[in-house]
Amino acid sequence: MSFKDDLEDLETAEDFLRFLGVTYEQRVVNVNRLHILQRFQDYLSADTGMEGLDDEGMAARYSAHLERAYQDFVASNAIAEKTFKVHQEEARKMADRFVPLDALLPT
């Protein structure tokens, strides 16, 4: 079986983390599993250098991207990371609502 074939058998965030050798804390995964997988997919999609890699090279690259995605949520949270569209839209709304202090003071 190839690396890609092995990936097709994975179902959960924990499956991916174990298969790719990423050490994780269950509490982080419990809260952020979808966000971690989405960020992992984002990193994979942005990686233009995987074409032509053998299985070992692909596994190393996938592992690095998953480690990075996981670490994003160890150090932060889903809202701050704005992983999903709903979080991105909320951040834009909040930016539109911002009123600088000097705009409130009489001139």
UniProtKB/Swiss-Prot annotation:
The keyword Ligase does not apply. The keyword Nucleotidyltransferase does not apply. Keywords: Nitrogen fixation. One of its GO terms (biological process) is nitrogen fixation. May protect the nitrogenase Fe-Mo protein from oxidative damage. Homotrimer; associates with NifD. Belongs to the NifW family. HAMAP family: NifW. This is Nitrogenase-stabilizing/protective protein NifW. It comes from Azospirillum brasilense.
